[in-house]
Amino acid sequence: MWCPEAKAQCESMKPGETVWVRLLQPVSSYSGKVGDKLQAMVIESPPCAGAESIAAGTVVLGEIKTVRRVGMGLVHETATLRVGFDHLLTADRREIEISARLVEIDNARESVKNGVIRGVNATDTPQGRITSRLKHLPTWNPYSDLTLIAFRAAFPVFPEPEIYLPRGTDLKLELATELRVPDEMRSTAQGSAPDEIDRATMEILAPSLPERTTTRNGQAADFVNVALVGTAEQMDHAFRSAGWEHGDRTSTHSVIREMHAFLALKSYPEAPISRQLMNGELAGATWEKSLDSYEKREHLRVWARNDVIEGQTVWLGAMSRETGATLSLRQHKFIHHVEADVDVGRGMLVRDLSLAGCVASVYYVERPQVERAAINATGDAMRTDGSLAVVQLKDCENPVFEPQRADAPAVATRPHSKLARYVRMQVLSFKSDVVRGNIVYGLFDLTRIAIRAQRNHAHRVEMAHQVETQRAPQVHVAAAATDAMMNR
C-alpha cells in the first residue's frame, strides 16, 4: 500500500530524469520508413518509495521520425535514424502522453547526438584509418602503392554501415517535460521479501568473503559484488532466459573471431573473458551480454562457494560493464576498459535476471571494509558503494521480457546481393580516399590523434589521483568497521 506521503512524492517524474526501455521489435535504417510504428517496454525507472516510478513491462509507443540510409553509398557515407517515443500505454489501453528524447543505446557501436542515432562510417575502422594514412606515403616513398594494395588485401574486412537495432536493444530516454504517472502504472516492490534467517546468514558470511579478484600474477582486479543463491541449473537457465551467453575458451579460433569483430566493428557475443582468480581458483563459469559492438558488453565471472544457504549453493560473482577496447602493446593482447561506476553493471545484471522471471528476492549486504575506489588490472579507475547484491534464484516463470527467437521474422538490414555490397564498399572506399587521402586531412588527423591521446592520458591520471585520495581515509574506516563486526 502507498502511504499519502509516498504517493504525493511519486506521482510525477521531473524533466531530466531518465528511463530505460527495451525494444520489442527490430529497427533498421535500410528498410525502415518515416512513420513506422515502434513499441518498447519500460525496464528501469528512477526509484521512489522503495519501488520504481514506472512498473517494468509498461509499454511505450513511438515511431521512426527521420531515417537516412547509406544505400549504395553514392550520397551518404553514414546512416542516421531518429526515433521518438511519445506515449505510455496503460493496462486498460489508455495512452499517456510523454515527451522524451533518446540519449544512449546500451552496448552499441552507434552514437547518439541530439536524439539522433548515428551509424558508423564503414571506412573509419582501424584498418581504414591506417589505409588513409598510407596514402600520404607516395610523397616520399615510390613503393607505397604496393604497400597500400598489400594492406587492403590483408584486411578485406569492412563493417556494415546501416543501422540495425534488434528486438531487445536497450535505449535510455530523458524526459523533456514533467510526467504525471497514473496510480495503475506505478510499480510496487518486486519479488518476495528475503528470508530473515538467510539474510542474517549472508551478513555473517560477508566479512569473510573475498573483496577483489586477482590476475594470474597476483594483481588486484575486479570487485566481488554479486552473490547468486541457487542450483547450477537455475543459474544456467536464468542467464539464458535473460539473453546472456557463456564466454568461449581462448583458442586460435576465438582469437581470429575477436580480430574480425574488432576490425568489422561488430559483436562477438561469446567472446572469451580474461581469466581471473578468486582464492587462487579460476572462475567456474562466465556470462556476458552484448549488442553490436566488440568494445562494449556486460560480463560476469562466477565461483561456487562451499557455503550453502537453505541447502543451496552460494555463487560469488565479479560483475563489470565494459565501455571500450584497445590493443595493448604492453600486454600484447586486446583489453577492455570498464565503466568507472561498477555498481551500474551490478544493477543491470539484477534487472535482466528479474525481467526474465528468475529472481525470488534481492537484497544488498553492506560491506564497510571494502574500499570504495580502486584501480583494476588494466589501469582503469573503479568506484563502488561496497555492497554485495544477493540474488535468490528460482525456476523461471512469468517473464516480463523474452529475447528474440531464432525463428522470428527478420527485417532487411542491408543489400541482399553480395555484388551490391561489394560495389557499395568500393564507392565508399573511393570517396574516403578522395576526401582523406591528402596532406591537409593527414595533418588534421594526426593533430586529432595527439589531442585525444593527451586527453585520455590526463583523464586516467586524474582518475588515479582521485582513487589514491579516497583510499587514505578508507583504510582507517575499513579497519574500524571490520573490528566492530568481528566483535559483535
What feature does the model see in each segment?
Residues 189-217:
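Compositionally biased P/S/T/G-rich terminal and signal peptide-adjacent segments
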Residues 50, 161, 220-228, 332-340:
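Second-shell loop/turn segments in exported
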Residues 208-238:
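Terminal, regulation- and interaction-focused segments at domain boundaries
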Residues 254-456:
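A cross-kingdom signal targeting lumenal/periplasmic-facing segments of multi-pass membrane
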